[in-house]
Swiss-Prot record:
Xref: InterPro entries: Peptidase_S1, Peptidase_S1_PA, Peptidase_S1_PA_chymotrypsin, Peptidase_S1A, Trypsin_dom, TRYPSIN_HIS, TRYPSIN_SER
Gene Ontology annotations of biological process type: proteolysis
Signal sequence, start to end: 1-22
Keywords: Disulfide bond, Hydrolase, Protease, Secreted, Serine protease, Signal, Zymogen
Domain Peptidase S1: 31-254
Protein name (Swiss-Prot/TrEMBL): Trypsin epsilon
Protease listed as a keyword: yes
CDD domains reported for this sequence: Tryp_SPc
Enzyme category, top tier: hydrolase
Gene Ontology cellular-component terms listed: extracellular region
Tagged with keyword Cell membrane: no
Site (Required for specificity): 204
Length: 256
């Protein structure tokens, strides 16, 4: 199955009819093949929450801006969103902030998953400290084979229904887009130029890590977007390519 699985008690109705058959948004899952980590190691990581439940990740861009995936915010109103920052645990700790507004990329397509990126403005400025920091966005793609890390909260298996409290992370390698769409893997032409792939055998982001950070060289290089299964050797994880959206992020962060 695809790694996108909606937390049924929270978002199933909101997302019905907007995602292609077999391609459900990855809104509440876990890192596959990874390890427990702390927010001090990933101080840019946030938890997007609705009705008190974690459903997506995100990355701190500035004192009042968070970057996430567009598919996380379909059929959702800003007043229903909360952002927890500064905690290793999505359920407690740190601080929780209301959302003033958000904007999905104008070219986002829920069928092809192109332009799967969004900007959130929170109500109050964040106070930066060791557990709450912005991350710089990439202005060029990392090289093929570069080490990257993805972090998030989620279930213990693809399609699972419970999520751990503790933040998890996994180390991956960047795969060039042309290689990701080659016969070596199973995606073919589904991989577009707005996307970035990362891979390690039996390691991956999974349901619930959506919108979260893929970081390489201390830069945000990707936003967790989609993929078939979790940790399937035939299918790398697919991310929104942050370098491709660099100008859009800067502009939208001023406008939203």
């Amino acid at each position: 199955m695809l790694k996108f699985a909606v937390l049924l008690s929270v978002l199933a109705c909101a997302l019905a009819g907007t995602i292609p058959d077999g391609l459900l948004p990855q809104l509440d899952g876990r890192i596959v093949g990874g390890y427990e980590t702390s927010i001090d190691a990933h101080p840019y990581q946030v938890s997007l929450q609705r009705y008190g439940s974690h459903f997506c990740g995100g990355s701190i861009y500035s004192h009042d801006i968070v970057i996430t995936a567009a598919h996380c915010l379909q059929s959702i109103e800003a007043k229903d969103l909360k952002i927890r920052v500064g905690s290793t645990y999505w359920r407690s700790g740190g601080s929780v902030h209301s959302v003033r507004s958000f904007r999905n990329h104008e070219g986002y397509n829920s069928r092809t998953m192109v332009n799967d990126i969004a900007i959130i403005r929170i109500e109050s400025d964040l106070s930066f400290r060791s557990s709450i920091r912005e991350i710089r966005i990439a202005d060029s793609n990392p090289r093929e084979g570069a080490t990257a890390v993805v972090s998030g909260w989620g279930t213990t298996e693809s399609g699972g229904s419970t999520i751990p409290d503790h933040l998890l992370a996994v180390d991956l390698e960047i795969i060039d887009v042309s290689r990701c769409r080659s016969d070596e893997f199973g995606y073919g032409k589904k991989i577009k130029d707005t996307m970035l792939c990362a891979y390690a055998p039996h390691k991956d982001a999974c349901q619930g890590d959506s919108g979260g950070p893929l970081v390489s060289g201390d830069r945000l290089v990707g936003v967790v977007s989609w993929g078939y299964g979790c940790g399937d050797v035939r299918y790398p994880g697919v991310y929104a390519d942050v370098a491709h959206f660099h100008e859009w992020i800067e502009r939208t962060a001023e406008e939203v």
